[in-house]
A protein has these predicted regions:
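C-terminal substrate-recognition "lid" of short-chain dehydrogenase/reductases
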Residues: 128, 221-250, 255-256
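Alpha-helical segment proximal to the catalytic Tyr-Lys
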Residues: 136, 180-184, 241
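Short, small/polar-rich loop/turn modules that mediate ligand/substrate recognition or access, typified
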Residues: 97, 183, 188, 243-245
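Active-site helix of classical SDR
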Residues: 131, 167, 175
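Substrate-binding pocket helix/loop in short-chain dehydrogenase/reductase
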Residues: 107-108, 115-120, 203, 213
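Short C-terminal tail/terminal secondary-structure segment
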Residues: 2-9, 156, 233, 244-263
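Conserved glycine-rich cofactor-binding loop
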Residues: 17, 24-26
Length: 263
């Protein structure tokens, strides 16, 4: 009989340190809260210090040990500085969640090269920057878990989202390559692919009528940031110790049924 502990416990991440990019608001902040409420010490980063300060205050109010760093994930030097500060503050880095993302709906005919590049740079290049720096500064020698936030809309394509589906498809491919190369070092790399989440800025930008969009999935509702964050928790934890290179789709089955064609 195994002596492995159940994953369904409040101290699942006790003793671990997690970094969440784009962690000041929305899914990133909820992910930091969920990881922290399960015992992790949490560092968050994004570009706006005021948002980071408010987020850390909220996390600390819940008894979570938290810190922040101002960082543009497109800049390798800033990413490196933030990870070095996490290591100085907490002494280790066990979990990296690449959540920073950009999004805005626009038809391809109106999408500028700079607009396309901006989203690819934040989503894909940012994921590369953070993952590579974390690996070189800590994970290569100590192991750990990387969870990359992607999407499911790239599986079929979606109107008004050419820049996003391109970036997310790149994240999927990058994640699998990292899983293969870094597995021998004890580094697991997995993907969470969320669908529409109620109340998030992404949903507000993409769909004015969130309920109409959500009803396209078999569960007939939008998801919540908590439901997605709990998927991240699983992949970040030792409960997923034999899982790498995998994608956990958390979209109510929408990728099976939703049309990418606008109404």
């Amino acid at each position: 009989l195994t002596t492995r502990q159940s994953p369904f416990r409040a101290d699942l991440l006790r003793g671990k340190v997690a970094l969440v990019t784009g962690g000041a608001t929305g899914l990133g902040l909820e992910t930091a809260r969920v990881l922290g409420s399960h015992g992790a010490r949490v560092a968050i980063c994004s570009r706006k210090e005021a948002n980071l300060q408010a987020a850390v205050a909220a996390l600390r109010q819940e008894g979570i040990e938290a810190s922040y760093g101002v960082c543009d994930v497109r800049r390798h030097d800033e990413v490196t500085a933030v990870i070095e500060e996490v290591l100085r503050t907490f002494g280790e880095l066990d979990v990296v969640v690449n959540n920073a993302a950009g999004n805005f709906p626009v038809p391809i005919s109106d999408l500028s090269p700079n607009g396309f590049k901006a989203v690819v740079d934040i989503d894909l290049f940012g994921t590369f920057n953070v993952s590579k720096a974390a690996y070189e500064l800590w994970l290569r020698d100590h192991g750990g878990a990387v969870v990359n936030i992607s999407a499911a809309i790239q599986y079929r394509g979606m109107a008004l989202q050419a820049h996003v589906v391109s970036a997310k498809a790149g994240i999927d491919a990058l994640s699998r390559a990292c899983a293969i190369e870094w597995g021998p070092d004890g580094v697991r790399v997995n993907i969470v692919a969320p669908g529409a989440m109620s109340g998030t800025e992404g949903v507000k930008r993409i769909a004015a009528d969130d309920q109409h969009r959500a009803i396209q999935n078999p569960l007939r509702r939008s998801g919540s940031t908590t439901e997605v964050a709990e998927a991240v928790l699983f992949l970040a934890s030792d409960a997923a110790s034999y899982v790498t290179g995998a994608t956990l789709v958390v979209d109510g089955g929408g990728w099976l049924t939703a049309s990418g064609v606008p109404d």
